[in-house]
Amino acid sequence: MVKEDERADGHLTAASSERPAYLDPQAPVGERIADLLGRMSMEEKVGQIMQLDAQNDLRSDILDKHVGSILHTSPKRLAEAAVLVRQTRLRIPLIVGEDCIHGYSFWPGATIFPSQLTMAGSWDPELIERSARVTAVEASATGVHWTFSPVLCIARDLRWGRVDETFGEDPFLIGEFASAMVRGYQGDGLDDPTAILACAKHFAGYSETQGGRDASEADISHRKLRSWFLPPFERVAREGCRTFMLGYQTTDGVPITLNEWLLNDVLRGEWGYEGMLITDWDNVGRMVWEQHIQPDYEHAAAAAVRAGNDLVMSTPGFFAGALAAIRDGLIQERDLDGPVSRVLRLKFELGLFENPRVPDAARIAAEIGAPDHTALNLEIARRSLVLLRNDGALPLMSAESAVPNAVKRIAVVGPLADDENNQLGDWAGGSGQVNWIDEEPTGTIVTVLQGLREEVPDGWNVSYAKGADILRLVPDPAGAAFADGQPRPPVQQACEPDPALLDEAVRASRQADATLAVVGDVIALTGEGRSTATLELFGAQNELLEKLCQESRATGKPLIVVLMAGKPLILPQCVHEVASAIIWAGNPGMQGGRALAELLLGKIEPKGRLPISFARHAGQQPTYYNQIRGQHGNRYADLTQEPAFVFGEGLSYSSVEYGPCTLSVVPGDGNDGDGALAGATAARGEESSQVPVAAVEDTIRIRVQLTNTGTRPASETVQVYIHDKITSVSWADKELKGYARVELEPGETRMAVVDIPVAWCSLVDTRERRVVEPGEFEALVGHSSKDQDLQALSFVVH
């Protein structure tokens, strides 16, 4: 058999009987890495730990800078990159990365799911895992090996532009959903050709901003990080997420890119993480041109290598800077061997040296937007919609509906009711991060208007009036480009009310039996670098809602309001006073309009629950439920502290009654203690008669009886929060530690069971240790995080 070898100039030949060890798929990965490292030049090592934007000079990046990875790669550039790699000396394959945040973002016709925040409304890790599996299957078919997802940031300041990318405000739920997404992406192992690398981001504390401003200083202590922000990352690190992305921000004056405590002491030390660390976009350059903590790219490159970064994203100046740093003795060439080895290990484990996984035309045709992927997308959209208010107007086809039983006429009003790309939200075809796709292909998205028209019975009439414009874009007065040459996006300017549009909307409402108003935000108002100072509806949307509320008051006809937005926005007071129903749709993805139509008509049941709280006013923040106890009073002088809608909230079309609750202890030896150990029992509103005692190695088991007292099927999400009554340090009043989703037919009674390891009932003490303190606890069981929705079961930890 003809084998490849290396010429004097390093190029592979087919003349020798021996092939290099790094090309032997039977050799251990460690041996292959060592062999290849020994063959690489200093320049090739520097390039190997660089990832550059494939929208730029791809030929120079691969042939001159020897880059190890590329991102934002168009279909045309993917094929070009494969050809260029074969022209390199060692033919080291590229890792191709892409921002597949909630679906395969930038391939025409690929599946775009609801946003992370919207999917979190399903409270269903299994569905989220399946969405990630679909994304991996589609992306891998096109030659993508890596997604920069999931996002594990905690959304606490709703002004922050990237709230939509998170799973919400609760660390426990974030860990549940992020873990599921990692499993979906990475599949059964990296040798599976449909697997792609997952990337946990943004490590860590990135969302703890100043004033909600993206990438601003995160004023956060080590103890606070350990308490709330690190646990989801620790979970996915220990479960095998192969890459981590480092946030833009500084913490305590040190950029995360250089934070040796986080990167080396915690991540690689305490957690034993062996995966690859990548900077976020131009983190190394930002130390020079934005944060001004390094004098030039030479010093910035040296600092990044010393701190333990493995791959430098989109800093072209790193190449010359790192070479200069080696030449001047700031770092040694051997300092590159660790990061280069970690990059190469992933390439070997992915099997890229044997199969570089270039675009596969047959798989692309079979997988991109496949019917089963669309069906899953619809199911996730259905499960994610959250019904927040309903006075009986919904469902529209119910005999009990407030809409007259004559011929149905529905007025669909609002600027987002028939807006395909803004329905998808950020990180999708029209969101502007890449230059080869302006919007998703027509026909792949079902808007609310389209969905209703397709789903209503024969004889119904669905009219449409836009009613308002949201914004217009104008050039940024600060200039056309940032300091690094990246173009500044245009700035948004709110549109004024248009009397003609308002009159058209009022006429449509007056002529209908019910009005559906679809309002929210647009891509220009959400995402990276797009934080907002307020949470109000932009443009003329508030004026539109005022007019529609006036009409509803005058006619008595139902007004249904749908909030389609990347983050929790504030609805005007008139909506809270007048609207018959309110639905949070988030960014519901390609099938969102159909799912919403089915919900409105009663073809499906509402099942979603809020993963995040809604403020009444931007100045009311923070509104997240798990705040530290201990303040004067429980309201502002001018406003309640109670959010408009709370974490965990969500209605069904039926009613579910909570019956008696019990708490028992399952011993740590695994034997079921039900019936064998004393347990706490409480009926609604009653105190428990016994207090179980548990050890740290035990599990508490909560059972609650649920009865569907309505005439329609119901889906109830039983939530269990832990309240540690006396703590050695200030701590949250309650934390979600478990939940169960229960389906109930009309009149059915079922028992829900939630198990919570006592070890989860922990806090972080003053020495930054996570511990379970002995003492009295309560398990708070109920429908949402509202105190009035919860019943308490006491237990003691010894």
Where are the regions a protein language model picked out?
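Intrinsically disordered, low-complexity regions enriched in glycine and serine
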Residues: 669-678
